[in-house]
């Protein structure tokens, strides 16, 4: 079972072949595989370390105790387990390595680990070990520590909160109408959360979470790599689909996504973090009056996302669709916003469709193409897509599609033209089916950070 997302208490994993049907097999497997750890012993701690990819070293040199060291590239957790002792006698020491290789401590995090063991709160202890291990694995090196990045992000979000609090006067106003209140180590769980919205006496919050940062390549988010296990089903003899091995990874820094299920943090708020990641091609889609001016963050710029082979480019513009900006749109939009984000994240497949919807003759020249997406909010969210070959700016080379996301999440092609001529309803219907299929294909999202060269 997936973690709850922003707009429902429980979000079930859907069947890929039938999105309207809950995948109960997957649900039960997930439930069985998520049985909480509760073994407070030497073997239990060893199991927990191996489960989350930490190295384990055991020191039994002293007769009455065993010292376990759970080690990553940055973190070191020393757990002293006395023989025949209670959980209250177990000691935990947490240390981190800095860029120079020296150790430093985090007394707050260490105390949370100790308290969880002392109170036999094994689920909380496991969550915190998992969080530490994940951030450790996500750090490409000691010099590029996600723990340091998170500290910088926390400072930025706290500065934003204090600036908004001085303007809006009350904490409640910042939570309801501002950009939220950051909370560190909320309810004993390590990490940074943002309380950002209240509705019907419920306070919504999200945890910032990093996942598997790579050791290679330039900093970017990679969307749509090896999405298809086989070529798509041919819908028409006029469509010449590219094979899987022709898919090219597309780097983009449109959004910094920490956890795809929960919250997409507006890029204005993570500018210091992006700077540390050496990601500089940042765009602010609209002039935000609140903290972009307060903190001197950039207002507007144009961003182009280039293919690795440098022969293609993608330009993305539109609104910053974050949970805390939903107050700007009618209430029925939240369900539809996920549909919009799904379309944007599927733009590799969208480009494949557009490259093949013209004719087989042009398939060879598809390596010099550009896709421009824009998002609008009217009665329904609107996606405006414009496709053309690079260096051919005349109207005869353009394909323009206007898609709307209906209240039930279905996509509707409102308008489609090729070479300035509107296509027939039948042609638009075929395209709509192709687009709908892409929403059922899983996404591979990775975060790349530039290597540190000594």
Curated annotation (Swiss-Prot):
UniProtKB keywords: Activator, Nucleus, Transcription, Transcription regulation
Gene Ontology terms: cellular component: mediator complex; nucleus
GO molecular-function term, one example from the UniProt record: transcription coactivator activity
Superkingdom of the source species: Eukaryota
Transmembrane segments: none
The keyword Transcription appears for this protein: yes
InterPro entries tied to this protein: Mediator_Med1
Main localization of the protein described in the UniProt heading: nucleus
One biological process term in Gene Ontology: positive regulation of transcription initiation by RNA polymerase II
Annotated Pfam families: Med1
Location in or out of the cell: Nucleus
Protein family (similarity comment): Belongs to the Mediator complex subunit 1 family.
Described purpose of this protein according to its UniProt entry: Component of the Mediator complex, a coactivator involved in the regulated transcription of nearly all RNA polymerase II-dependent genes. Mediator functions as a bridge to convey information from gene-specific regulatory proteins to the basal RNA polymerase II transcription machinery. Mediator is recruited to promoters by direct interactions with regulatory proteins and serves as a scaffold for the assembly of a functional preinitiation complex with RNA polymerase II and the general transcription factors.
Subunit architecture: Component of the Mediator complex.
Name assigned to this protein: Mediator of RNA polymerase II transcription subunit 1
Organism: Schizosaccharomyces pombe (strain 972 / ATCC 24843)
Gene name for this UniProt entry: med1
